[in-house]
UniProtKB/Swiss-Prot annotation:
Keyword set includes Nucleotide-binding: no
Active site: 191 (proton acceptor), 403 (proton acceptor)
Stretch forming the signal peptide: none
Pfam families xrefs: Transferase
Localisation per UniProt entry: Cytoplasm
Keyword terms, alphabetized: Acyltransferase, Alkaloid metabolism, Cytoplasm, Transferase
Gene3D superfamilies: Chloramphenicol acetyltransferase-like domain
Function: Malonylransferase involved in the biosynthesis of curare monoterpene indole alkaloids (MIAs), natural products such as strychnine, a neurotoxic compound used as a pesticide to control rodents, and its pharmacologically active derivatives, including brucine, used to regulate blood pressure. Curare alkaloids act as animal glycine receptor antagonists. Catalyzes the conversion of 17,18-epoxy-17-hydroxycur-19-ene (Wieland-Gumlich aldehyde) to prestrychnine, which is spontaneously converted into strychnine and isostrychnine.
Catalytic activity: 17,18-epoxy-17-hydroxycur-19-ene + malonyl-CoA = prestrychnine + CoA
Entry protein name: 17,18-epoxy-17-hydroxycur-19-ene N-malonyltransferase
The keyword Transferase appears for this protein: yes
Tissue: Mainly expressed in roots.
């Protein structure tokens, strides 16, 4: 039985009026795996198909060379709203609104409703996006108070976030209704077809369609030849991406502390350091310090920071371009005396400058996506063992602009990831700081979370 199907039992099949396909009406489930026991009622599982068929000329979506390097891993994001808006009196109305608007939106994102065919392409066969509806017998404040304990199991299909893809399905969504009238809308989207910017664009279009059924999305489905790559060197990617026994923690960097970090970097010669650069550097420094303490010796390492290429390439791509349109700026550290905060910020800046210079010219096959990072990883892997620290910034992406008609989300929630040495940076809801979701091996995290240098600039976000 597949992962999703194995979660449920005693099901009855009925017809969905929205998409004329079957969904399941589920019994009540009690969640005993969190600090509190919540009643979780699985209402339905539906396949939402595009409102209009995909034309024959678009029946195959071929992957770019960079897409092919991506794992079929679900990237999760959940949008939490305290109310489902004025003029809507029941969850049935919310359900119909979201299903109909999703169906219309998918007609513009035709490959999202298709099925994966190996690593080569998507069969745009309109089979649909999987949508779950769930009712949780608790107020949304329970999720907001306990992001580290309860949130993931309540707003995502169990076991799905960050997992390897569920067969050939590319997108899974869930609508969670709370007793207080709050609602969470989550998506798990395959990294084979999207990056963070693509997720934000799709969610904004779905939300706009819910507000106005005549909305016309204009996603730019990028040609597979727009970002060419030559042969990719062998790396330790499988070792980097494999799941480990890890612990995750969330840290808050207030704007005032980020200003202090930027001043420290500027005083050491880095011109106009960015908030992401300084937060990345201090997290990297403290993580390597903790790892060195746990291991008993320093290990050479590489830092990879994902960079959105849409505005960088020549000619620039539209912000609404859909696909994996990213690269990595990277720094390699071979000696412990290089692990100084100003040096790390400076190296990040130099790597980013080189990336901008490369992609600011017309793209050539000799200027390869991703290799700015993987060539350094290859050099390290040819020698001794090395660690890899992977940073992704969701900051400044328009995730908090996703408005289905009941206002901005009170929280955009990203669940913890089981892959070690991963760091995800997001804006705070009030846009007054950065939240960092950090995942490290379980013997490293206790050292990291008590690092005095880290805690001078960041506070640990605890469940209340």
């Amino acid at each position: 039985m597949n992962r999703i199907g194995s979660l449920y039992f005693n099901t009855k099949f009925v017809k969905s009026k929205v998409c004329n396909s079957t969904y399941k009406a589920f019994p009540l489930i009690i969640n005993h795996h969190t600090m509190a026991s919540f009643q979780i009622q699985i209402i339905s599982e539906t396949l939402i198909k595009p409102s209009s068929p995909t034309p024959p000329s678009l029946k195959q979506h071929r992957f770019s060379d960079y897409d092919k390097t991506m794992h079929h891993m679900y990237i999760p994001a959940a949008f939490l709203y305290t109310s489902h808006g004025h003029g809507i009196t029941s969850t049935d109305e919310v359900s119909q609104l979201l299903k109909n608007s999703l169906s219309k939106t998918l007609s513009h994102y035709y490959h999202f409703a298709g099925r994966l065919v190996g690593d080569s392409h998507v069969d745009c066969n309109d089979m649909g996006v999987k949508l779950f509806e769930v009712r949780v017998r608790c107020p949304m404040t329970e999720v907001l108070k306990r992001p580290n304990t309860d949130a993931k199991d309540l707003v995502f299909p169990k076991g799905l976030p960050w997992s390897m893809g569920e067969g050939d399905i590319l997108v899974v969504a869930q609508i969670t209704y709370f007793d207080c009238g709050g609602i969470a809308i989550s998506t798990d989207m395959s990294h084979k077809i999207v990056d963070v910017s693509s997720i934000a664009t799709f969610m904004k279009d779905w939300a706009a369609m819910a507000r106005n059924s005549s909305h016309q999305p204009y996603p730019v489905i990028v040609s597979p030849t727009i970002l060419p790559m030559d042969d990719i060197p062998a790396t330790a990617e499988d070792d980097i991406m494999k799941e480990n026994i890890c612990q995750s923690r969330r840290f808050l960097f207030d704007d005032s502390k980020i200003v202090e970090l930027k001043a420290m970097a500027a005083n050491s010669g880095v011109e106009n350091p960015t908030r992401v650069e300084v937060v990345t550097a201090i997290l990297h420094k403290c993580a390597v310090t903790a790892s060195t303490t746990a291991l008993g010796s320093f290990m050479p390492n590489i830092l990879l920071l994902a960079v959105n290429l849409r505005s960088i390439v020549s000619p620039p791509l539209a912000n609404t371009s859909i696909g994996n349109i990213s690269s990595c700026c990277a720094i390699s550290v071979t000696h412990e005396n290089q692990m100084k905060f100003p040096l790390l910020v400076g190296e990040l800046r130099r790597s980013k400058t080189k990336l901008l210079q490369n992609y600011g010219k017309q793209l050539k096959k000799s200027e390869l996506l991703f290799l700015n990072g993987t060539d350094k990883a290859q050099k390290l892997s040819d020698g001794d063992s090395f660690d890899c620290f992977i940073f992704t910034s969701w900051c400044r992406s328009p995730l908090y602009e996703v408005d289905f008609g009941w206002g901005r989300p009170v929280q955009v929630y990203v669940p913890s990831c089981p892959i070690k040495n991963t760091f995800r940076l997001t804006d705070t809801p009030a846009q007054d700081g950065i939240q960092a979701l950090v995942t490290l091996e379980e013997n490293v995290m206790p050292i990291f979370e008590n690092d005095e240098e880290l805690l001078a600039f960041a506070s640990l976000i605890k469940d209340s």
